[in-house]
């Protein structure tokens, strides 16, 4: 009798007793099958029953049913996945250990789903999720696998890029301070519809009113006397529209220009009075517009000048040395260089 591994020591005796119990002696073909399966049993403890297709002799047909039943029971007893009672578990092969790493993934997914369900139960009844908190029992896979962190579904949708600025809440917004006095009604603002706030006017370029045209910014006569402006553009950090009092022209005014506040730099450079007509008190954006206005409106006044004013002009533009008269002052200054 050959020596069997410890995990299959009882298997040959079972097959022999079952075959003897049914009255069929052990045939030489059965012995050949046991001998052929010995090297396979010694390698990985997995019995392989090899049957010969070309059976010779009448003993192959005798006890065939008994041998089939015995081999089936032997396969059930020595199955690698089911442990036998009273015997140690057989060592797992490399293929089974590698397969166990993939079988853990469904369990980890189930844990993650359960943790998400628990986080949803702890949310507020209004439907707003609470602060995202990491669970203490983080599911970990076997060696070499990644670590999965469980976050609530609401926090996952609220995650944003690290480079984007956080949105300010309405409570954190500074209190709006009105530019105009509190006692003045909004109807007295004329064409400037709406109430202007200092927080909405961070700079001059952001001042945009649908009724305030670009051309109207240059059609300004003068700034009101009771509108002190802060020198923001000269170095002060505060807004230039803070603590200002706007003076709105009366509705009966014949001027069609829009009244607005200009920063101090524009008034200091003289942009509001650069193309200004002294006769009709109008300002123009372009110099060509002022020239066209002077030729069309004030041309008749210069047609018939006063003789007394013309005489005084000639006396003022006369050379004190040779008493020569000139029409222009620069002609007189050029003439005076010849006497030096």
From Swiss-Prot:
Residues annotated as region Disordered? Answer: 77-180
Q: Where is this region: Important for transcriptional repression activity?
A: 72-187
Q: Record's SUPFAM superfamilies?
A: beta-beta-alpha zinc fingers
Compartments where found: Nucleus
UniProt keyword terms in alphabetical order: DNA-binding, Metal-binding, Neurogenesis, Nucleus, Repeat, Repressor, Transcription, Transcription regulation, Zinc, Zinc-finger
Q: Which ranges belong to the motif Nuclear localization signal?
A: 298-305
Q: Per the UniProt entry, what are the Gene Ontology biological process annotations, in alphabetical order? A: negative regulation of DNA-templated transcription; oligodendrocyte development; positive regulation of myelination; positive regulation of oligodendrocyte differentiation; regulation of DNA-templated transcription
Q: What InterPro entries does UniProt report for this protein, alphabetically?
A: TR-Histone_Methyltrans, Znf_C2H2_sf, Znf_C2H2_type
Q: List, alphabetically, the GO terms of the cellular component aspect.
A: nucleus
Sample GO molecular function, one term: DNA binding
Renumbered to this chain, the Pro residues biased-composition regions fall at 82-91
State where composition is biased (Basic and acidic residues): 106-125
Q: Which SMART domains match?
A: ZnF_C2H2
Checking Gene3D superfamilies in the record gives: Classic Zinc Finger
Q: Where are the zinc fingers (C2H2-type)?
A: 275-302, 317-339
Where does the UniProt entry say this protein principally localizes? nucleus
Q: Give the quaternary structure.
A: Interacts with OLIG2.
User: What's its job?
Assistant: Transcriptional repressor. Plays a role in oligodendrocyte differentiation, together with OLIG2. Mediates Notch signaling-activated formation of oligodendrocyte precursors. Promotes differentiation of adult neural stem progenitor cells (NSPCs) into mature oligodendrocytes and contributes to remyelination following nerve injury.
Family, according to the entry, reads as follows: Belongs to the krueppel C2H2-type zinc-finger protein family.
Record-given protein name: Zinc finger protein 488
Upper classification of the source organism reads: Eukaryota, Metazoa, Chordata, Craniata, Vertebrata
């Amino acid at each position: 009798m050959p020596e069997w591994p410890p995990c299959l020591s009882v298997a040959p005796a079972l097959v022999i007793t079952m075959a003897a119990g049914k009255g069929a002696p052990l045939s030489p073909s059965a012995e050949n099958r046991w001998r052929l399966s010995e090297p396979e049993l010694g390698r990985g403890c997995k019995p392989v029953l090899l049957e010969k297709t070309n059976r010779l002799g009448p003993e192959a047909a005798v006890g065939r049913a008994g041998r089939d039943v015995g081999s089936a029971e032997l396969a059930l007893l020595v199955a690698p996945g089911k442990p036998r009672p009273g015997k140690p578990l057989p060592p797992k092969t490399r293929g089974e250990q590698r397969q166990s790493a993939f079988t853990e993934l469904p369990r980890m997914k189930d844990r993650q789903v359960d943790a998400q369900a628990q986080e949803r139960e702890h949310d507020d009844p209004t439907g707003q999720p609470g602060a995202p908190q990491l669970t203490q029992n983080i599911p970990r896979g076997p060696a070499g696998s990644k670590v999965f962190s469980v976050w609530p579904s609401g926090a996952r949708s609220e995650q944003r890029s690290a480079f984007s600025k956080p949105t300010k809440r309405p409570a954190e917004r500074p209190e709006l301070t009105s530019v105009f006095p509190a006692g003045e009604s909004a109807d007295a603002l004329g064409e400037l519809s709406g109430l202007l706030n200092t927080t909405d006017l961070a700079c001059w370029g952001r001042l945009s009113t649908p009724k305030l045209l670009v051309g109207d910014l240059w059609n300004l006569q003068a700034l009101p006397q009771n509108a002190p402006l802060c020198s923001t553009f000269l170095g002060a950090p505060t807004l230039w529209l803070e603590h200002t009092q706007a003076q709105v022209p009366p509705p009966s005014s014949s001027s069609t220009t829009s009244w607005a506040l200009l920063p101090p730099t524009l008034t200091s450079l003289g942009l509001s009075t650069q193309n200004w007509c002294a006769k009709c008190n109008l300002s123009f954006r372009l110099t060509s517009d002022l020239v066209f206005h002077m030729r069309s409106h004030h041309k008749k006044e210069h047609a018939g000048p006063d003789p007394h004013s013309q005489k005084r002009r000639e006396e003022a533009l006369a050379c004190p040395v040779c008493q020569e008269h000139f029409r222009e002052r620069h002609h007189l200054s050029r003439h005076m260089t010849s006497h030096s």
